[in-house]
Amino acid sequence: MQYPERDLPREGTLDRLLVAAQYLTGRVSSKQLWRIVGATRSTLPLEEVRIRLRREGFSLELAGAAFALIRAAAEKTKGMRHHDVQLVGGWAILQGMLAEMETGEGKTLTCTLPAATAALAGRAVHVITVNDYLAERDAETMRPVYEALGLSVGCIKAGMKPDERRAIYRSDIVYCSNKEITFDYLKDRMTLGGRPRPIAQRLGALAGDERGGKVLLRGLQFAIVDEADSVLIDEARTPLILSAPVDAAKEEQVYRDALRIAKALTEDEHYFFEDNQPMLTEAGGERVRELAAPLGGVWSGPRRSERFVLQALTALHNFQRDKHYLVRDGKVQIIDENTGRLMPDRSWEQGLHQLIELKEEVELTGRRETLARISYQRFFRRYLHVGGMTGTASEVAFELWAVYRLRVAKIPTNQPVRRVYLPDRVYGRAEDKWAAVIESIRERHAARQPVLVGTRSVAASEHLSKLLEEAKLPFRLLNARQDADEAEIVSHAGEPGRITVATNMAGRGTDIKLAPGVKELGGLHVICTERHDSGRIDRQLFGRSGRQGDPGCCEAILAADDDLAAEHATLAAGWFTHMTLLPQRAGRLLYWLAQRRAEAAHSRARRSLLTMDESLGDLLAFSGRGE
C-alpha cells in the first residue's frame, strides 16, 4: 500500500529570503478567481468529469464542470444553491489558497466544492476542523450532497477503535479534527517505522511485509482546513506528542519534593517571571540547592534540581483551575484554550500534568514517555495539496505563506455586512466592568433582543452566571463544564429575549440563526467581556452576529486589570486601575499594545517550535529513527 505525502527539505536563510520576496511580488488575481463563475455553466456528465479529472487534473474547465454538478446536487438534496462568491471561494481552495470568507457566508457549503471535486479526481480528501462537534455536524449536514455524486463520507471522532478509524479513512471524504488526524498520522509513522518511502513500501509488499495493511490513513493527499488560522497559527505553538504511560509510583516523591521546594521560595527574591515563564534568581538557585541537598538521588545535580523546581513553579502559578483545566471525576482535564472544550485524553508533558494533579490533590497518573512527536507546521506541509478557509486570516497572511505556502484570497460577501460595532468600554477594575455588562444585558433583554456574552474561561462564565442570577435575569450557560446541551442551547440563542453566556465554545463555527421577528429588534447582540491574545479570536466572537446580511450589534466591555492587559501591558494597565472608565483612546491603545505583545510572543514561540522540530527531525533521521 502506498502512503503518499510531500517530502520537504529543510530551508536555509536564502530560501526564506526568496519566500519573502515571492510573497511581496506575488498577489492573488481577483479576476482570475472570478472566471470560475462562467465556467460553472458547463453541462458535462458526471462520469466524464470523473474520468477527465483523474486524467487531466483541476483545469478551469473541469473544475467548472464539477462545480456545476455539485451545485445541482446541493440544490436537489438540501435546497441550497451555491452563491457566486462561494464558487470563487471553492476555486481558491482548489488552487491551494486560503479563502478568507466573512463569518456567516456559508463556508460549510463552500467546502463541498473543492472536497467533492478532489474526491471525484480520486484523491483521499480530509476536511479538517477544530473539534469533533463541528466535524460531525458538517459531515452529516453535507452527506446527502456527496452521496448524490456517488461519493462516500465519514467522520473520525475521539474514542474510536483502530479498525473503525481505518474503515472510515477509506471513505472518499473524511471529516475530522486537527488533533485526531495528526495523532493518527503519528500512529502510522510508528507502524511504518519512520517516514513512508514509496520504493521501500513496494519492496516490502513484494516481500510480504503486512505493515501497510495496518496503517490508518491513505496518506496525506488533499486537505481542506476549516478555521485555518486557528489550526495553522493559534494551535501551532504546541507540538503533538504520542506517548505511553510510565509507572508513577517511583516518581511521586520527586514531584512532591519539587512542589514543597517551590512553595518555600519567595517571588522577586528567589524567582521572577519573564514572558510568563519562571526564572530563578541567583539567591533562588542557592536556596534550591540548599533545600535539595538532603534529598540525594535525582536531586544531586543542581541543574536537574532547578529544572524540577521551575516546572513546579509553572504548575503553581501559570496554570489555573477552571481556566486552563477542570477537575472532573477526580481527574485533571485540560481545557483547549482556542475552542473552550475539554480534552480528557490529553496531558501536559515533562511531569507538568503530575505536578498539577498533586497541587489539586487528585490521584496521580503516570508520566507519559514520548513515542513520537510532530508540530502542526511540519504535519500540514507534508500534504501534497492543502487549502483552507476562515473568516480571519489577513493579520497572519505572511506567516501562512512563509510556513505553509498558503496565499490568502479575500472573498467578498454575498450581501453587505450590517453588523454595528459599538465603541469599546474599558473600566479600571473588574467589578465596574461586570456591573456594566449586567446593565447592558438588562437593557437588551428589556427590548427582547437576544444577547450572546463571550468569556475567556469557565471561571469567568460562572462568575457572570452568579451575577445574572442575583439580577434575576434568565440565561443559559455553555462552557466546558456545562456542555451536554450545546446543540440545543445554540439552536435557541437567536430567539427573542434569550441570554446566552458562553466561553469560546460559542465562537468559531457556531451558526446562531435568528428567530422570526428578531431582525426587527436589531438582531443578535454580542458582548465581549475580555479580549483574547489575538484579535482574530475576538472577531470570530463578533462574527456570530450580523451573518448573511442580517442586522447585528457587538461591543467589548473590558477592564484594565483583565489578564491580557495585566500580563502583556503591565505598566500601562497599572496607570488606569484607579479610574472608573478610561477615555476611549486610552482604552483602545491599552488593548492594542497588549494584543501586539501577546501575538509577538506567540509568533516567537511558533518559530522556536518549528526550528526545534526540524532540528529534532534531522537528528532522528540521522539516527535511523522516526520523528
What are these regions (language model features)?
Residues 1-582, 588-627:
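Conserved P-loop NTPase motor core
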